[in-house]
């Protein structure tokens, strides 16, 4: 893997002001994305995965949301200090995104041609005719049949899988350095999921040192596609490791519980193993250990002290949010 850093995220905090209080959706998160790698973020719903990705692209709606602290460095430049126009020149060109819901991500009243061409005209300065030709080529690359005809159709004339292919084509049109894929296979059947993931990996390989940030709750997808993985819960990182280290030696009790919840084909069992309790509301999370409500004191990362452990390096390149006592 290339060791040149593409994105550096330092002490990122993204909060939402609500009538019930301040929701700390992302609370002091730091990690790097390297050129050419596929970095996964996994966790339950409400763990802060999507808010992290939206923060990178500065798409947090304000109000009620706000990035209250941190740095997001792209090639050494802090994206949080850029003006709206400066960020608009990066968003969609250097950093692009595939959104979570393909059925609603496209504008229903505009033809596909109009939506795809807009990106190329804005960022690459192409004429409408040249933009249309490049858009047709991209639709062909992502497997849309008869692209020269279908480019004039409206989104409702495509299936969910085809709409996601269009979203991938749009995201990759300007050869971005970073592609953020926020649960790109949500609401798609298993066969289409596999096709979409294969397509993303094939297109990435053809683009050399471009990176992918893949957000999902599916550990099987993570295992198949990623080089490294971040496990999030409660708005903080619980573990960061290479894909090999994470599956061979998960350290955080939360990561271990996620692994245990995966059905094993070679183990006969009457019932599935599941984490006890529910994901607490972000409004209910304070500065104490986020895992206490899901684990018995002796099994928790804080060993029952309720003090939030620091993210510590447990082996080279492998970090986990556990206390020293937990590692003994």
What residue ranges belong to the model's regions?
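ABC ATPase NBD coupling module
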Residues: 79-96, 122, 245-250, 282-285
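Hydrophobic anchor residue at the start of the ABC signature
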Residues: 116, 168, 179, 192, ...
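P-loop NTP-binding/switch modules centered on Walker-like glycine-rich loops
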Residues: 184, 188, 192-270
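A short, proline-enriched helix->beta-strand linker immediately N-terminal to the Walker B motif
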Residues: 173-177
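Short catalytic/signature loops enriched in Gly
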Residues: 4-5, 22, 145-149, 243-328
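Conserved ABC ATPase "signature" region
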Residues: 71, 78, 129-149, 259
